[in-house]
């Protein structure tokens, strides 16, 4: 909280961006819906203030879109998911190889049940960076939701290789069983 207030008072793009990114990363790991919403709104405000200082900064636009998708979008607010997707689409229309934007668009596609588009975007990210665990995991989930068991299992197996942790592998094996039994 104090970091965000200090950044607003200082009003430098660097400090606003630092605070926004820190809050965004914390928000992505937050389980409490109330805290997640507060962090999303706080980070979004900081990204908006930074964008006022540097309106062409694509990373700031991706950060702002991410706040909407990972924040209220992740807990079921479709309007916020779409708001984030619109923000991110502006970025990929200028640069289709912006993998940060493609990743969050892919995640937004899964959240909003737009699986074919999500799969397309997430495949683009993993072809660019095959070790991107977040993209691989969401891609597996997207294929599972689409009913494509073979690809879901393939990407779940890939995630096990990337993490190489027995507890994680056990959890993924359970998920694979669920996919195969549906």
Tell where the protein language model's regions lie, with residue ranges.
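Structural marker of alpha-solenoid helical repeat scaffolds
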Residues: 9, 53, 94-95, 128-129, ...
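Canonical tetratricopeptide repeat
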Residues: 18, 22, 63, 104, ...
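Amphipathic alpha-helical repeat scaffolds of TPR domains
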Residues: 10-30, 55-73, 100
């Amino acid at each position: 909280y104090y970091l965000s207030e200090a950044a607003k008072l200082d009003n430098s793009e660097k400090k606003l961006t630092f605070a926004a990114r820190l809050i965004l990363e914390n928000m992505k790991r937050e389980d409490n819906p109330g805290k997640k919403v507060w962090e999303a709104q706080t980070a979004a405000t900081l990204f908006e203030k930074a964008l006022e200082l540097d309106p062409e900064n694509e990373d700031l636009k991706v950060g702002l879109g991410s706040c909407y998708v990972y924040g209220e979008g992740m807990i079921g607010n479709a309007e916020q998911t779409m708001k984030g997707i619109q923000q991110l689409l502006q970025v990929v229309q200028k640069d289709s190889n912006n993998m940060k934007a493609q990743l969050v668009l892919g995640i937004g596609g899964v959240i909003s049940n737009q699986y074919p588009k999500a799969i397309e975007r997430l495949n683009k990210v993993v072809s660019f960076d095959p070790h991107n665990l977040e993209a691989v995991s969401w891609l597996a989930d997207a294929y599972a939701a689409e009913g494509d068991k073979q690809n879901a299992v393939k990407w779940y197996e890939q995630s096990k290789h990337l993490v190489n942790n027995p507890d994680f592998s056990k959890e993924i094996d359970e998920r694979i069983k669920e996919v195969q039994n549906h």
